[in-house]
Amino acid sequence: MTRLHRKHRIALGLGLGLLLGFGGTTVQAAGDAALYEAVAPKGSTFVRLYNASNQEVSANVGSINLEDVSPLSSSGFEYLPAGQYSARVGSQNLPVNLSAEHYYTLVTQSGAAPLLVEEPAFKSKQKALLRVQNLSDKPLTLKTADGKTEVVKSVEPKGRGDREINPVKANLALFDGERKVADLKPISLARGEVVCLYVTGTANQLNPVWVKPPVKE
């Protein structure tokens, strides 16, 4: 092999190295940026919208827009700087004070003023969290569908109850004391996941809905 040919091979090798090495790193970085969401700045607060009404609703808080949330569905959590805001939920306004590193759900119901509900963070990677947000006017207990096992102890009206459990698929129901008042859709829980049961309405007509983070397309 001549010295000239060796130079050509070295140059070709360097060119391929740049293309497959550094170029690959650039492509990978771009892919990672598309795959992972931006990290919230330290001191941010987190808000989502749960729509307990029978029509599509949008909301905005500060710089974030929670748009076109379907009935009995929720948006994902969005972050913004902590502080005091006027939240616009549908056609109504709600003054809110959002603390740093806290999570909140704006709740809209037909014929009622919007509410701000706090959602304490859950950091376990081994367990799942079942949460009951009881916005009804009746104390309620979450049990297995057969009523034999209490899962979340009685939650007072406008109160919250939590229970860490192992990942599982479960058939559960709401009880008023020993009386079953609502069967719930089967629910699957994964490690590190928070699944929240929002109960709206009154004792005469309860509306329990499992609220999970929406699946992204």
Swiss-Prot record:
InterPro entries named in the record: AlgF
Pathway(s) served: Glycan biosynthesis; alginate biosynthesis
Entry's localization field: Periplasm
Annotated signal sequence range: 1-29
GO CC term (a single one): periplasmic space
Keywords: Alginate biosynthesis, Periplasm, Signal
Role according to the record: Together with AlgI and AlgJ, forms an inner membrane complex which probably interacts with the alginate polymerization-transport complex and adds acetyl groups at the O-2 and O-3 positions of mannuronate residues. Acetylation of alginate increases cyst resistance to desiccation.
Protein name stated in the entry: Alginate biosynthesis protein AlgF
Species for this entry: Azotobacter vinelandii
Lineage: Bacteria, Pseudomonadati, Pseudomonadota, Gammaproteobacteria, Pseudomonadales
